[in-house]
Amino acid sequence: MELEVFAGQEKSELSMIEVARAILELRGRDHEMYFNDLVNEIQTYLEKSNSEIREALPLFYTELNVDGSFIPLGDNKWGLRSWYAIDEVDEEIIALEETDEEDNPKSRKKKRVNAFMDGDEDAIDYSDDDPEDEDSYEADPALNYDDENPDDEKNEADAYDAEINEIAPDDLDEDVDINEEDDEFSDDDAEGEEE
């Protein structure tokens, strides 16, 4: 295969990405290529060995993805972005999304009727909850606190007493003297400071 674009140029000076672009341009729009076939044709044109191609393959694949002139067409097929108008690319993406939705139909939710809305289409129906809200929250019954249950209050008091006993056990026989008079500060000093 001979590429007229590179006539007179040394093949060893050409990059794989340049050759890929030239090969795809030569083949035309209706002949997009699988990645493996594209690499094989590049290898044939540049007359490189398998080990040279294997070594350059990660960089080539990265350049192919980063270079804005190439477009992945799915199933590891590649083409040139210039072959497709922007609107056409969007249409293909939308068509793929529509087929995905057809494959996985969503279950319909029953419509609730609000008697107070009276057919006012502009009114906001606040009773129409999000699907995430439908999953009800069920608390652990052991954690449920009942105001009328005296056992809850007793358990709470016992837990409080246990915490106090951890800090100051009941068997301490020390007398703690509280000295109400403070030598450094007296009530007279406080009155003098306020004035």
UniProtKB/Swiss-Prot annotation:
Source organism phylogeny: Bacteria, Bacillati, Bacillota, Bacilli, Lactobacillales
InterPro entries attached to this UniProt entry: Asxl_HARE-HTH (IPR007759), RNAP_delta_N_dom_sf (IPR038087), RpoE (IPR029757)
Domain HTH HARE-type: start-end pairs: 14-83
GO molecular function: DNA-directed RNA polymerase activity
NCBIfam families hit by this protein: RNAP_delt_lowGC
GO cellular component terms, semicolon-separated: DNA-directed RNA polymerase complex
Protein name: Probable DNA-directed RNA polymerase subunit delta
Biased composition (Acidic residues): 119-138, 145-195
Superkingdom of origin: Bacteria
GO-annotated biological processes: DNA-templated transcription; regulation of DNA-templated transcription
Keywords of the record: DNA-directed RNA polymerase, Nucleotidyltransferase, Transcription, Transferase
Similarity annotation: Belongs to the RpoE family.
Residue spans crossing the bilayer: none
Function: Participates in both the initiation and recycling phases of transcription. In the presence of the delta subunit, RNAP displays an increased specificity of transcription, a decreased affinity for nucleic acids, and an increased efficiency of RNA synthesis because of enhanced recycling.
Coiled coil start-end: none
Claim: Nucleotidyltransferase is one of the keywords in the record: yes
Self-association state and partner proteins as the record states: RNAP is composed of a core of 2 alpha, a beta and a beta' subunits. The core is associated with a delta subunit and one of several sigma factors.
Gene (name only): rpoE
Region (Disordered): 119-195
Pfam families assigned to the protein according to its UniProt record, in alphabetical order: HARE-HTH (PF05066)
